[in-house]
Amino acid sequence: MTTIVAVQGDGYTVLCTDSRIATIDDSGSSNPVTTLGYGMSKIAQNGPYLLGAAGDVRAINILHHVFTPPTPPSNLKGKKLDAFITAKFIPALRECFEKQGYGSSEPGKAPAEQNSLIILSIHSTIYVIDGDYSWASDAQGFYAIGSGSNYALGALHVLAPKRKPVVSTAKTIAIKALSAAAKYDSGTGAPYHTFVQEQPAKKPRNTTKNQQTRKRVK
């Protein structure tokens, strides 16, 4: 159980995740809810990407510790970046998942499907990849996935300024959106980790203050 929110700005992206996990049994009941340990997050930098997932912890493990994503040319953006994600990134992701034995075992689902929603940022552009490996981007630049996504997405739209927010504003509303989700969704909870990806590229920087982690990546 997870909530991840993201904001697409002009030349930057902000991704923010909670730290709560739970096991769901066959009846749909949630078993003991726990919090990820120190140094762990549902989002991580992998090469030039920020990668996160809502669904199975196994998907997060593979994304962060096994998957070697293909690197797009540094100047790739727009439709050419879309094509790269479609033709290069997603096939590599699917191959990695299948090699690791991760996929859908639910009756009626195609073998190609898996059980998590994946969110990524590359070149300060956000993509959300569904269980069937299709991807989408939001025209307004606001994203939320996971068990508390409805609460978080509503909060993002209410809190967002009329114009595209600057990075500091985007980080603030992302944290507030997660806090709103945590109030109404038992599967969402602190500490919250915030990641920033900006263009032009800057050297990675990771600072921790209280419950927030900030990363700047190429």
Regions found by a protein language model. Give the residues of each.
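Conserved short S/T/G-enriched processing/targeting/catalytic segments and their helical context
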Residues: 1-105, 110, 136-172, 184-205
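Catalytic phosphate/metal-binding cores of nucleic-acid and nucleotide-processing enzymes, i.e., regions
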Residues: 109-125, 159-176, 204-218
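Long, charge-patterned amphipathic alpha-helical coiled-coil/hairpin "stalk" segments used as oligomerization
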Residues: 111-145
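Low-complexity, intrinsically disordered Gly/Pro/Thr-rich segments
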Residues: 176-182
